[in-house]
């Protein structure tokens, strides 16, 4: 995936990178079931990239600091040996940044399909 434009969010207007955009997209797709492992699997399945779980968690922490996502700790589950999961959801700033990124990407991609097929 090309990283065409950087988007800014939050009070410090920090840039939103390509992987941050992918993480935000995964959170939206996963709705209430967005936690580190499901986010990792979603991105891997859709991009064909192999990811380290640490990269996902580092990005989630950064997105939380930027005010794009919020997290909460779920209830312990038997499948996790009584451990809890940390879930994530978009905050309004994250939704705005993702909408802007999506809009710019689709605008930039408009009309490229035919031309890309013609390239050798």
PLM regions: where:
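Short, intrinsically disordered or compositionally biased N-terminal tails of bacterial proteins
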Residues: 1-14
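Amphipathic alpha-helical dimerization/coiled-coil segments
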Residues: 4, 93-120
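N-terminal helix-turn-helix DNA-binding core of bacterial DNA-binding proteins
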Residues: 13-55
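Short secondary-structure boundary/capping segments
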Residues: 15, 61, 78-80
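Short aromatic/hydrophobic contact patches that present stacked aromatics
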Residues: 24, 87-89
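Basic amphipathic alpha-helical segments that dock to polyanions
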Residues: 56-63
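Beta-hairpin "wing" of winged helix-turn-helix
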Residues: 66-81, 89
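Exposed loop/turn and edge beta-strand positions of beta-sandwich/beta-sheet ligand-binding modules
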Residues: 84
